[in-house]
């Protein structure tokens, strides 16, 4: 179950390794109204599907020409790296954002969180 308190639409990766933006109903950001009630929705993840949550600072990351990173570019990099381990998946997205913004200072946070449902990643443990 979930609700949306002003968040960006997550990206869902499916077991067939396609991906798309999740069709989510937008609502007010948390804290705007003290007595606002957020509707609750349900979603069932199939084993092997995943989700990427991100802040608006990702798609609104600007370069020196003041061009945004965009949702379309985010979806492209996700599609190219969807087979990666979640840790590497996030690193590749961050590298692509960095290549877009270069040294241009950002005024917003860049936060990404991903998970894969029902998959195990057997990686060596760090010592």
What are these regions (language model features)?
Residues 1-127:
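Conserved subregion of the PPM/PP2C metallophosphatase catalytic domain
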